[in-house]
Amino acid sequence: MHTPLIDLRGIRKSYGGGDSPRVNVLRGIDLSIHAGEFVAIVGASGSGKSTLMNILGCLDRPTSGEYLFAGENVAELGGDELAWLRREAFGFVFQGYHLIPSGSAQENVEMPAIYAGTPAAERHARAAALLDRLGLASRTGNRPHQLSGGQQQRVSIARALMNGGHIILADEPTGALDSHSGAEVMTLLDELASQGHVVILITHDREVAARANRVIEISDGLVISDTARDLSTPRSANPAALQAVDLRKRLSEGSGSHGAWKGELLDAIQAAWRVMWVNRFRTALTLLGIVIGVASVVVMLAVGEGSKRQVMAQMSSFGSNIIYLNGKAPNPRAPKGVITLEEVAALGELPEVKMIMPVNGGQAGVRFGNVDHSSYVGGNDTHFPAIFNWPVAEGSYFSEADEQGAAAVAVIGYKVRQKLFGDRIDPIGQYILIENVPFQVVGVLQEKGATSGDLDSDNRIAIPYSSASIRLFGSQDPEYITIATRDANNVKQAEAAIRTLLQRLHNGKQDYELTNNAAMIQAEARTQNTLSLMLGSIAAISLLVGGIGVMNIMLMTVRERTREIGIRMATGARQRDILRQFLTEAVMLSVVGGLAGIVLALAMGAALLASKVAVAFTLSAVIGAFACALVTGVIFGFMPARKAARLDPVAALTSE
């Protein structure tokens, strides 16, 4: 006697309990089915026949009793092994067809083979052959809504046969069809049974049940009759059908086989893209949050980096070997210290000092014709262009003779030139009024640009130190001293030498302070970095909001596609397959949104550059923003994906 392929012993199934009343749906089912049988299970609505089919197809577990499949106790099988059985042993044909709306007929048929890890070319060919065999060769690209009821049911039969369909579980396969389409479906099931497939037909129609060679009637969860009839033509088991002996080996091998992970991932990506395209309006709205978030982060960081580079370049252009010396009050009650010209001369003798220049200046009103302007006026000596690496663009700098004679000459900055003279008037030789004192313009400095905040280096006027002291400010003592060291790498040593000399000259009083350009550049860099971080953090909030939007949409998608999840599980999807599918969709949303956000950011950057705004895109910022979008997709997509993977197959299939 051969071991039954399916052997049920005392199977019971009940629902409820606890605070709700317990409902006994199956109350002790004993049933054996051998390879090659065509069995019809008949019963009225509510008799338990659909619950029995779910248990037979490993979609549900009994409350008690023993279910042996090819001698293996199904209760001892894990989730992956049950999925393998649904994928390799069973093929489901449902009354409601249960096709995935977003997929074509070909894609619906291929689904079990995807979860089996079948190579793409092989499954494409097999699906096409099955559809051709069932008369749907011209409908392979049609979606379910483009097919009639009979055609949809034939697609579901082809899907059931995709991985062999050794056991066909047909739940009311003709219930939603007209008589002609129903007859066609039953003819197909007859053919499958004659070819050796086990066909288990669930129906309430006794005429349909009469097509089977064995009719089992259940009522109120019990088998009340089991009738077999002789066949005029004996059915022989298909050599390819599952046999109890080889199933044990195939089950242990197959449940551990996951297929090629690259192929599975590619299939998940293709399915995700298909879903996104079908629901493209919703997809676009969901992407908007990610796009705006990524674009905001990239543009904000680019603006911050551009501003930083601009400021750093301008500050560095003045030289990193510059030291500034000015007097200060040693304590709140003491007067501010004064650096005299005699001390300037003494400092100039130090071997570490290359050049030294006293500066006497301040903000002053400037006029040319009827144009008034406010500018910084600095009394310098002839070392100014060399110390600051700031050549003259037009005319010439004032001479040593001008300094000695306190000449009323001026070299103006680029911004002063534009404000007073514009582009039409040549400023060289023109007279301007500085605090109502006439000065002749002898030169125009090259454009430097703003360094930080409101400080604009081009909004200045250089005049001889002697002229500033005598004609404008009335003081011989400098406002501060500018010192250029011989070696930019030894600024600290130069500072130490200057301090030592000043300590001696000032009798130990700390009524002065030293700052150097390098330290100022570093401080400004830290400020700019902090500003960039703040801008990026503000922009990142929009990316976070976009991620929450992805999670909300995915949670709604899981609810809307609950039946699809049940279909995938019925065709052999494991929990991790469902998890991967929905997580891939979330990540795909983030990837597409991230790429679109980068493109938008580059376009916005180009517009800002055209508007003369300093922008500097960095690869790290672009990659970082894209990576954040990707991580956002994983984090906010995981919870919906996990929820989808944990759905009960039966509950998912019966959801509306």
Curated annotation (Swiss-Prot):
A Pfam family: ABC_tran
Top-level class of the enzyme under EC nomenclature: translocase
Entry membrane topology: Multi-pass membrane protein
Membrane-spanning residues: 284-304, 538-558, 589-609, 619-639
SUPFAM superfamilies registered for this protein in UniProt: P-loop containing nucleoside triphosphate hydrolases
Gene3D superfamilies, A to Z: P-loop containing nucleotide triphosphate hydrolases (3.40.50.300)
Residues given in the record as ATP binding sites: G43, A44, S45, G46, S47, G48, K49, S50
UniProt keyword terms in alphabetical order: ATP-binding, Cell inner membrane, Cell membrane, Membrane, Nucleotide-binding, Translocase, Transmembrane, Transmembrane helix, Transport
Main subcellular location: membrane
Function, in words: Part of the tripartite efflux system PvdRT-OpmQ required for the secretion into the extracellular milieu of the siderophore pyoverdine (PVD), which is involved in iron acquisition. This subunit binds PVD and drives its secretion by hydrolyzing ATP. The system is responsible for export of newly synthesized PVD after the final steps of biosynthesis have taken place in the periplasm.
Protein name according to UniProt: Pyoverdine export ATP-binding/permease protein PvdT
One GO CC term on file: plasma membrane
EC numbers on record: 7.6.2.-
Gene: pvdT
BP GO annotations: xenobiotic transport
Keyword Phosphoprotein listed: no
Subunit structure: Part of the tripartite efflux system PvdRT-OpmQ, which is composed of an inner membrane component with both ATPase and permease domains, PvdT, a periplasmic membrane fusion protein, PvdR, and an outer membrane component, OpmQ.
GO molecular function, one term: ABC-type xenobiotic transporter activity
Cell compartment(s), UniProt: Cell inner membrane
Sequence ranges assigned to domain ABC transporter in this UniProt record: 6-245
Family: Belongs to the ABC transporter superfamily. Macrolide exporter (TC 3.A.1.122) family.
Aminoacyl-tRNA synthetase among keywords: no
Organism encoding this protein: Pseudomonas syringae pv. tomato (strain ATCC BAA-871 / DC3000)
InterPro entries reported for this sequence: AAA+_ATPase, ABC3_permease_C, ABC_transporter-like_ATP-bd, ABC_transporter-like_CS, MacB-like_ATP-bd, MacB_PCD, Macrolide_Exporter_MacB, P-loop_NTPase
